[in-house]
């Protein structure tokens, strides 16, 4: 399947709807999927030069965090889902601005998540 990319402003928190520990522009790569369906497999990067945010990401490495992407550039609904994040090595990121993002669960591409939907007839 062909890959698609989206660039959107985003933030990472320790839990869903939590206070952000890092924020910046995110590049998300995923295989073409049905619009508005959750993305099970995706990866990306965040640009973040804030030293405190980078320290928080380093301290949380190996744990599941939460990514929230704001609507931008033709996407009219926020995207959100669990993520693991780690700083990219200084050999590949000499300016210390890149954070690698890896799926830790589906990335929901609409305002109401799958887990929040009310069953039919309820």
Cite the ranges covered by each PLM segment.
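Short linear motifs in intrinsically disordered
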Residues: 1-4, 51-61
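Surface-exposed beta-loop interaction hotspot
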Residues: 2-4, 114, 118-122
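Solvent-exposed edge beta-strands and adjacent loop segments
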Residues: 2-43
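One face of beta-strands
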Residues: 8-12, 24-26, 42-46, 63-65, ...
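Short conserved beta-strand and strand-loop elements enriched in small hydrophobics
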Residues: 8-17, 59-74
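Charged, amphipathic alpha-helical segments
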Residues: 37-56
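Short beta-strand and beta-hairpin "edge-sheet" elements
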Residues: 70-115
């Amino acid at each position: 399947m062909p890959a698609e990319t989206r660039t959107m402003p985003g933030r990472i928190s320790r839990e869903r709807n939590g206070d952000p520990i890092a924020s910046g522009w995110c590049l998300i790569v995923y295989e073409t999927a049905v619009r508005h369906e959750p993305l099970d497999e995706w990866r990306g990067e965040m640009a973040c030069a804030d030293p405190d945010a980078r320290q928080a990401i380093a301290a949380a490495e190996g744990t599941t965090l939460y990514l929230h992407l704001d609507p931008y550039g033709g996407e009219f609904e926020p995207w959100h889902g669990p993520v693991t994040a780690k700083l990219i090595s200084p050999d590949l990121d000499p300016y210390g601005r890149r954070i690698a993002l890896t799926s830790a669960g589906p990335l929901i591409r609409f305002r109401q998540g799958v887990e929040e939907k009310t069953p039919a007839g309820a």
